[in-house]
A protein has these predicted regions:
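Acidic, metal-coordinating helix/loop segments flanking the phosphotransfer/catalytic sites
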Residues: 17-18, 30-53, 61-63
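Conserved acidic segment of CheY-like receiver
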Residues: 1-12, 16-20
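Hydrophobic/aromatic residues positioned on beta-strands within the core alpha/beta folds
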Residues: 90-92
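C-terminal output helix
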Residues: 97, 109-125
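Conserved phosphotransfer microenvironments
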Residues: 51-82
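Conserved acidic residues
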Residues: 52, 102-105
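Short acidic, S/G/P-rich loop/turn micro-motifs used as interaction or catalytic elements
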Residues: 9-13, 59-65, 95-97
Length: 127
């Protein structure tokens, strides 16, 4: 399974990679801003090798070196408007619900968010 993680926090990205490795997933590409992440998504589709899953935070820069904004929302809207069918998991330290995407994970060190992530990913892999 090929995954793109759009996340500006290196430590959280590494945590997500560890959770995914518990599902046997090692192929995780990373972007830390919306502009580059969107290019990676479009390039994967244009090259006929789309990602199997996109994991996105809610708050990260829209552009390289930019300020943090609600870029996850923009990404989800773009996916819907462009009819992109790659499943999206929102992994945020804000407990959010988005019924139009594959799933949401509430990232918090006080809870077992890894199990929530692994349940969603394993369900996706199982089809």
């Amino acid at each position: 399974m090929r995954v793109l993680n759009i996340e500006d926090d290196t430590f959280k990205h590494n945590d997500i990679c560890k959770a995914l490795s518990g599902c046997g997933i090692k192929d995780v590409e990373w972007s830390n801003n919306l502009a580059d992440g969107w290019k990676q998504i479009k390039n994967s589709i244009d090259s006929n090798n789309p990602y199997d899953l996109i994991i996105t935070d809610m708050y990260y820069p829209g552009e390289p070196g930019g300020r943090e904004e609600q870029s996850g929302d923009i990404l989800i809207d773009r996916e819907i408007k462009n009819k992109i069918t790659i499943p999206v998991i929102l992994c945020s330290s804000v407990n959010l619900k988005y019924p139009e995407i594959y799933g949401c994970v509430y990232y918090s060190r006080e809870r077992n968010w890894e199990a929530d992530m692994q349940t969603l990913v394993n369900s996706l892999v199982a089809g």
